[in-house]
């Protein structure tokens, strides 16, 4: 299992790890933002020279079949493309090289804050989500996420009031170097917001 650094795991990953990808290279969730508008989707297909966006996945959370990758020498294919300037860098390269051998995961394994997880109208107001997921999938993902992915320009260590910032700070408070993080926020004038967040945490424990 590969996880980006800007994620929080909220539940057991054993079910994800046990998923069958014997005939695949990777498994991930559909990268909804690349599915719409159609012009953007077509442009990605042209750049990567692929026939469909149906299996284009976000690279932030991946289940990887290393055995198949080594068997088919995918490292060489990656090395050949790594010097090219793809718009989404590693994500584009992974989708290009692994095309045809990608399994789609349920979006609860990579619930991205940029899609407004706490907004009841997020699905209705986002055409990309409607193309990538069913309403049932999306509701399940945002209400019962296994992994929260802060896949946006704003991160919880920059804005303690963003969606699911509470979960990130709760995890950060357990780290041995949390005092360093806290001191940095004091320097940035964020101490009041952090105190409010931590006091809220104390009330919930």
Residue ranges and their predicted role:
Residues 24-48, 162-170, 178-181, 197:
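A short, conserved beta-to-alpha structural element at the edge of catalytic cores
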Residues 22-29, 34-41, 52-54, 78-91, ...:
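Glycine- and acidic-residue-rich phosphate-binding/metal-coordinating active-site segment common to enzymes
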Residues 59, 64-205:
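A glycosyltransferase accessory/donor-loop signature
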Residues 49-61:
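A recurrent flexible, glycine/aromatic-enriched loop bordering the glycosyltransferase active site
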Residues 1-38, 56, 63-64:
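GT-A fold catalytic core of metal-dependent nucleotide-sugar glycosyltransferases
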Residues 45-52, 133-136:
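Short, P/G- and charge-enriched loop/turn segments at secondary-structure junctions
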């Amino acid at each position: 299992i590969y996880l980006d650094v800007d994620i929080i795991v909220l539940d057991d990953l054993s079910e994800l790890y046990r998923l069958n990808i014997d005939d695949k290279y990777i498994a991930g969730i559909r990268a909804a933002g690349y599915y719409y508008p159609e012009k953007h989707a077509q442009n990605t297909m042209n750049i990567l020279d692929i026939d469909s966006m149906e299996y284009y996945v976000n690279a932030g959370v991946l289940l990887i079949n290393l055995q198949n990758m080594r068997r088919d020498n995918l490292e060489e294919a990656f090395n050949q493309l790594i010097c090219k300037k793809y718009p989404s860098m590693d994500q584009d390269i992974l989708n290009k090289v692994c095309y045809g051998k990608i399994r789609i995961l349920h979006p609860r394994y990579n619930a991205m804050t940029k899609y407004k997880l706490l907004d009841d109208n997020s699905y209705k107001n986002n055409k990309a989500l409607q193309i990538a997921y069913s309403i049932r999938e999306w509701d399940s993902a945002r209400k019962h996420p296994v992994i929260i992915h802060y896949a946006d320009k704003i991160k919880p260590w920059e804005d303690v009031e963003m969606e699911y910032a509470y979960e990130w700070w709760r995890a950060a408070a357990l780290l041995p170097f949390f005092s360093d993080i806290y001191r940095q926020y004091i320097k940035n004038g964020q101490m009041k917001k952090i105190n409010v967040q931590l006091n809220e945490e104390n009330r919930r424990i």
